[in-house]
């Protein structure tokens, strides 16, 4: 399945030291920040912090070049556990576009841990793969990677992982092969071609995501089935 091949491109498990991991995270955070795709927390990037489901939706809308549309969304948000304002706009927009179904019909669990499987599912959608049309399924999106010990998919995602996966996805071709995700964002005017090239995300080849199990020293985090 093309989706599994893409997942294997995005997720490559290698041994990497904590200092080296932190340096990669910081570099990639700067690259995304320069393009307006990743913002700090007010006291830095907090790359060692856990990524939440709301973080995943925000990053997805940016990766699709649709953040302005999300922030101006004035339709209903079906999730009673999402705060009013920007969180409601992001999640309401994502639901309306079919990017998320929540964890139930009325809850999204915005502060819940974002798993590798959830975020790679979001990235696959950003790349033009449609699980609704059978291009892939949430349940199978990382099964091959897990079976090959490429990814311990039961662990939650850290913000540094979110950044690194996003950089890899930006350099990955869209499902229709017309361009990379970064090139498509440049065409939409999210950033310029020159800015994309300056950050090495356009014309620089592809960078595989490197997962370090050293981050995941705690107990496994259970996943929720919906996305």
Walk through the language-model features, giving the residues of each.
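Feature responds to low-complexity, polar/acidic, surface-exposed segments characteristic
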Residues: 1-28, 34-89, 97-117, 124-157, ...
